[in-house]
A protein has these predicted regions:
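ER/Golgi luminal nucleotide-sugar-dependent glycosyltransferases, focusing on the catalytic module
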Residues: 6-254
Length: 254
């Protein structure tokens, strides 16, 4: 791994099915509110065992080291309660925890709760397995920029993605079919302004249907198409880190 890489991706998606047990994660009283800020981070986590229990905290630490006072919101997506360290969570600063009511919905949850709560003006939405290694000027990423882009269309799930886009409505489907005009968003991770996300509110018409790895993968294209629809110039400055398939050996299935 090159030391010049400002972000590291430890893993993409755990192969195991998410547990049906819902944790009781709550934000300690001294962490429930922070003042509105121009920038914040949203980490979507899913703890399944001792190993994955370390990911979100390492991600939190990597942010804190470079952005000491920036607010962080951690969205818990159906973690196994046996591996949640409530004492550790109570010691974190400028940090809130949100328990999702949509189990196994995955990355889209970061946007759903950011749209709903507007904790800050701009959010960096990442997985719990992304670790920031160097300072990035995320404030310059407006109104939206992917963390990694997907250049290939070889992973497109045309049948299911078409079905979901039809349920969302609008004119997104015609853009989806014009493959040269958009790129995928790896892991549905992006830097996004709240005002811009408001334009994409129809995306959450299908949030209750995102319950499998296949559905979550489809959102890499659906989210991207909606971003391009509302901001066609995205193609000129697409992502922070470039094409994920050219990224040096920092990711894989675990």
């Amino acid at each position: 791994m090159s030391r010049s890489m400002p972000l590291r991706l430890q893993k993409y998606m755990n192969k195991n099915q998410a547990s049906s047990v819902r944790p009781n994660t709550t934000t300690p009283p001294n962490q429930r509110h922070f003042s509105f800020q121009p920038l914040g981070f949203v980490i979507v986590r899913c703890i399944q065992d001792k190993r994955t229990a370390k990911y979100w905290y390492k991600s939190y630490q990597s942010i804190r080291r470079l952005y000491p006072s920036v607010p962080i919101v951690i969205i818990d997506d159906n973690s196994n309660p046996l591996y949640i360290n409530h004492k550790l969570q109570s010691q974190l600063t400028h940090c809130q925890f949100v328990q999702s009511e949509y189990p196994a919905c995955g990355e889209i949850l970061g946007y759903y709760y950011f749209l709903k709560h507007r904790w800050f003006q701009k959010a960096v939405v990442i997985h719990d397995s992304v670790f920031i290694r160097a300072h990035v000027d995320f404030q310059a990423c407006s109104p939206v920029r992917f963390i990694w882009q997907i250049e290939t269309k070889g992973f497109d799930d045309i049948e299911l993605e078409t079905e979901l886009l039809q349920k969302i409505g609008g004119s997104y489907l015609s853009l989806y079919e014009d493959k040269d005009k958009w790129r995928g968003c790896f892991g549905v991770m992006a830097v996004i302004d709240h005002d811009f996300l408001v334009k994409m509110g129809d995306m959450f018409k299908v949030i209750g249907e995102i319950k499998s790895r296949r559905h979550r993968s489809c959102m890499e294209r659906i989210f991207a198409v909606m971003c391009f629809h509302h901001y066609p110039d995205l193609l000129s400055h697409l992502s922070v880190m470039g094409d994920i398939h050219e990224y040096p050996l920092g990711w894989g299935y675990t």
